[in-house]
Amino acid sequence: MTYSLGGLIQATDYNGFASTTAGGNVNIMWGTGTSDAGYGQSTTLATVSAGGTVTATQWASLVNRISSIASHQGTTITARTAPTAGTVIAVLSAVQTDLNSCYTNRGNAAGTGSQYTSWTGTSSKTTATGSGSTAWTITFTHTITWASANAARYFFNAGGRIKWECSKTSTGTLADTEWNDLANTLVGDIYITGGTGTQTINGGSYTGTTKSGGTGTPTTLATTTGWYDLLTTDTTIYKQFADTSPYTGQYIQINAKTAGTGTQLVLTTTWVDPGGSGAGSSDNISGGTATSGISFGTAPATVVTYFPPSTTYLTEASWGTPTVAATVA
């Protein structure tokens, strides 16, 4: 690249910044990109033909797009003013340095969108479960579906987060107390992000599978497993056991996988009681009232929602509106 103070701005210089420099260029982050790079914005920069003139308008678009990317991420870059038509285009310092910084921080997001809570189906088991000291399992399945594999990529690349949470407050059996403690106190909220490294999103740190709250120490917490690490077969990303005898065999577990050729995230949550709690105790639990949105009833419930990326500095919500379908068995 010939781009330097006192030199002429050539088409190859501009094209490198816009789309041809490996890794650190505008279009790989702003446009379709590949894998964990790309916000899916349609307003990418056109290249200039070899030997062509780079106009002030084109240069301004480049400067403004770098600013938008950095602002979306919260990346600090060099302050610069976009040129205007009719003025001499001066060489601006540290353009490639700033692009490299933005590429390194491509998974970060300074803000977040509003929580989506309009899941469909059933997320709570309102009838009682178990009989005496017999083993039982409640299975909650949540399927998040995007319109395309690219839409799913854009969601995670731009800072989208999947949120998992559970609750149970119903009473009436000996086992209810410990199950309520497990679901409401020991288990925290679980967030699933892209997972290719640590992302700073809306001021929080996320690594793929991130636990927020909850006093329990899980036997499994796949901290570095996120969307890009999942397979089409189940991976256990979280498992928390109860902590009070004789119920320490009870647990809540989350398995995650992709489906639909990269268009779906499937979370299968199991509440498991192995039975055999012994004399003076029981393994059956109460049902209760149903959950709606993120307003929990009293029944055993597992809810999956999401926070889409912020569009404050982007031009479009390229990830669309993913749906969340819930079942319980």
Spans of features found by a protein language model:
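Solvent-exposed, flexible loop/coil segments flanking beta-strands in beta-rich domains
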Residues: A110-A175
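Terminal (often C-terminal
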Residues: T127, G188, I192-G194
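Long, acidic (Asp/Glu-rich), low-complexity accessory segments flanking structured domains
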Residues: G172-L186, G260, G280
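Extended, charged low-complexity segments
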Residues: G195-A329
